[in-house]
A protein has these predicted regions:
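Bacterial N-terminal signal peptides that target proteins for export
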Residues: 19-29
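Bacterial Sec-dependent signal peptides at the C-terminal "C-region" and cleavage site
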Residues: 39-49
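Bacterial N-terminal signal peptides
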Residues: 30-38
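Alpha-helical segments in soluble extracytoplasmic regions
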Residues: 73-163, 211
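A cross-kingdom marker for long, charged
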Residues: 204-232
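Intrinsic-disorder-associated, low-complexity terminal segments enriched in Asp/Asn/His/Tyr and depleted
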Residues: 3-4
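Surface-exposed extracytoplasmic segments
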Residues: 63, 181, 185-188, 205-206, ...
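Long, amphipathic, charge-rich alpha-helical segments that form helical bundles/coiled-coils
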Residues: 68, 116-137, 169-197
C-alpha cells in the first residue's frame, strides 16, 4: 500500500508523465498561460529590451522550484497518511529547503530582507497545509476549519508581499487568487489521499502542476517587466 501511495508521486514527477499527460485543466488557466507567454514575447519584440533566453531561464527556474514545492508537500501528505514519522521528517525538511530556494530566487531583485520575508510566508503556507493534512487524518473538523482560515489569510499575505515589491506589475489580488487556488489543490489532494482515491489523485496532479506553472510564469513576467535591465 505504501508503494502504491509513493508511486503516485514518483510517476507524476517523471518527465514522461509530466510532459505526456496534461490532464484536465481549467479553461481560464489555459487562457492565462497563453496570455503570459504572449505578453513576454510581445514586450521583447516591441521594446527590444528583454532577452527571451534570460526570461526563459528564469521561467524554468521558477517552474522547477514550484514543481518541487508540490512534489515535496505531496510526500509529507503521503507520510502523514501512512504514519511514517521518519520519512515525514525528511520530507518536511525538503519542503522547507525548497521554500528557501524559491525565496532566494528573488534576492537579486528585492534584497536579502525581503527574500527572508518571502521564505517566512512560504513556510507559513506549508504550515497551514500540514495542519490541514494532520487534521484530516485525525478527523478533527475544527482544526481543518482553522487550517483553511490560515491558508486564506496566508494567500492575502503573499499577495500583499508581491504587491508591495512590485505594485505596477503585480497589483492587489493578482497573486492572491493564484495562491488561494493553489491551496485548494493541496486540500483536494489531501482528501483524496485520505479516501484512497488513487485514480483521482493521478488526475489531480497534472492540474496542480499546470497551476504552479502559471504562478511561476506570472512571477517571471512581472520580474522581466519590473527589471528589464536584468533580463537584457
Amino acid at each position: 500500500m505504501r508503494d502504491h501511495f509513493l508511486g503516485v508521486g514518483k510517476r507524476a514527477f517523471s518527465l514522461l508523465v509530466m510532459e505526456g499527460r496534461m490532464g484536465k485543466i481549467f479553461p481560464a488557466m489555459v487562457v492565462l498561460a497563453f496570455a503570459l507567454v504572449s505578453l513576454v514575447g510581445y514586450e521583447s519584440r516591441a521594446g527590444g529590451e528583454t532577452n527571451l533566453v534570460r526570461v526563459a531561464e528564469m521561467q524554468k527556474t521558477l517552474r522547477d522550484l514550484w514543481l518541487g514545492h508540490i512534489f515535496t508537500i505531496q510526500h509529507v501528505v503521503l507520510y502523514n497518511t501512512t504514519n511514517n514519522q521518519a520519512e515525514r521528517y525528511i520530507a518536511d525538511k525538503q519542503v522547507l529547503a525548497n521554500a528557501k530556494q524559491i525565496a532566494d530566487t528573488f534576492t537579486p531583485f528585492y534584497g536579502e530582507a525581503r527574500s527572508e520575508k518571502l521564505f517566512t510566508l512560504l513556510s507559513d503556507h506549508y504550515a497551514a497545509v500540514k495542519d490541514y493534512s494532520e487534521a484530516t487524518i485525525g478527523g478533527n473538523t475544527q482544526r481543518q476549519d482553522a487550517a483553511l482560515t490560515h491558508l486564506a489569510s496566508n494567500a492575502d499575505d503573499i499577495d500583499a508581499f508581491f504587491t508591495g515589491v512590485n505594485p505596477d506589475h503585480l497589483p492587489k489580488d493578482t497573486i492572491r487568487g493564484l495562491i488561494a487556488a493553489h491551496g485548494a489543490h493541496h486540500v483536494l489532494q489531501i482528501n483524496q489521499y485520505k479516501k484512497k482515491e488513487y485514480a483521482k489523485l493521478e488526475e489531480t496532479w497534472p492540474m496542480m502542476r499546470q497551476h504552479v506553472y502559471i504562478i511561476a510564469d506570472t512571477l517571471t513576467t512581472a520580474l522581466s517587466k519590473q527589471f528589464p535591465d536584468k533580463f537584457s
